[in-house]
Amino acid sequence: MVAPGSVRSRLGAVFPFLLVLVDLQYEGAECGVNADVEKHLELGKKLLAAGQLADALSQFHAAVDGDPDNYIAYYRRATVFLAMGKSKAALPDLTRVIELKMDFTAARLQRGHLLLKQGRLAEAEDDFKKVLKSNPSENEEKEAQSQLVKADEMQRLRAQALDAFDSADYTAAITFLDEILEVCVWDAELRELRAECFIKEGEPRKAISDLKAASKLKNDNTEAFYKISILYYQLGDHELSLSEVRECLKLDQDHKRCFAHYKQVKKLNKLIGSAEELIRDGRYTDATSKYESVMKAEPSVAEYTVRSKERICHCFSKDEKPVEAIKICSEVLQLEPDNVNALKDRAEAYLIEEMYDEAIQDYEAAQEQNENDQQIREGLEKAQRLLKQSQKRDYYKILGVKRNAKKQEIIKAYRKLALQWHPDNFQSEEEKKKAEKKFIDIAAAKEVLSDPEMRRKFDDGEDPLDAETQQGGGSNPFHRSWDSWQGFNPFSSGGPFRFKFHFN
């Protein structure tokens, strides 16, 4: 329920001199009110004063039905319509009041206000002039004179706006239209004209705002819905485009342009929806294929190409295809350097490629655009840890595998290197010492990378075998002397080393 105070405020805004309720010089005997109608009028007045607009409206409907020639009933119903923001419904009631009582200056003045807001300037001027000729009160005369001057000024500005539009001076036309629409707020044609100016000036979202207003101000405005749908489509907002073109077809299911556009946007919407569902399911290769279909389905609107590449960039990054991800993410970032999603996805790809400086740069650029994004903050911290780690021991490099290598690849690389660097393969003490160190690193790399939890820690920038990075500072079994490793490997060649070395 609307609060009474709110209603009174609204009434005051729509009726400067007001009507709530003019009763009183016009009531009773002069109107010839019968008992039932008078009851409805009185009850409606009380409900209106209490802010119960819907109930008040019902009473005034009943009064009009009971006495179709009662101008007070129409006038009070117009009051409620205006308080409810229904100016279109109020206007016929005010016109009926004037037909029934030509000297009712309050109704004529109020109708002039509504006509002025609708941009019907000649009709508004006619009402204001008639008020001035009808022996108005001092306040009514002052108000009518003021509004007449305003209507004349709007006529002049309208002519200037049209001249500017015809001369393709859209900036000037917008300036004039801005001023007019502050007064003629319900003029659908002027809003549509300003929307055209905004389109010409490359401001589609402002055009959409005016066209949405025009679609409400003018009945069955299929053209406005069609234009809104086209603008959303060009902006890449396929879902809103589909919604608006459906509104057009609700009004006219045979509208040729709306139907043709509906088929196109529906097809595109389905493709994009399917692609996003595949991404949610982790089916990145299939999602990439879908977005390639999107680009083929709509090659003429650049926004869909950019958005599709942005999502393909994401798919490649998540699917651990860093080379492909970096390439297409970079294409997006050439067009949109501040695209946070592309920056994050390329940064992740750089991490896989062990390009830590580049990853840090991308995360920092993304953070400038969205400093509160936890994913960016965590990614940046990880990249910084990995950079620091890369300057120490890198288990992936030791085994010669990529960061996204599978366990089978890790074991295979480990076996090959363990055989190659087994100390028994070397004769001189210097070579053996070098092999010992290499062999220990290889064993450590295998230990870390074949254990999921240890590998996760290492991938996050923490060396699980480095005592300095462990809480509590415990000893590190892989940072011991070679003597402690004797007995580790099963290779035995009669040399000084005896190992038990198990390939897992």
Curated annotation (Swiss-Prot):
**Start and end residues of each J domain:** 394-462
Q: Show me the TPR repeat boundaries.
A: 37-70, 72-104, 105-138, 154-187, 188-221, 222-255, 268-301, 306-339, 340-373
Q: Where is this region: Flexible linker?
A: 375-393
The chain's disulfide connectivity reads: 248-258, 313-329
Keyword GTP-binding carried by entry = no
Quaternary structure, from the entry: Interacts with EIF2AK2 and EIF2AK3. Forms a trimeric complex with DNAJB1 and HSPA8. Interacts with THAP12.
Q: What is known of its domains?
A: The J domain mediates interaction with HSPA8.
Please identify the protein, giving its name as recorded.
DnaJ homolog subfamily C member 3
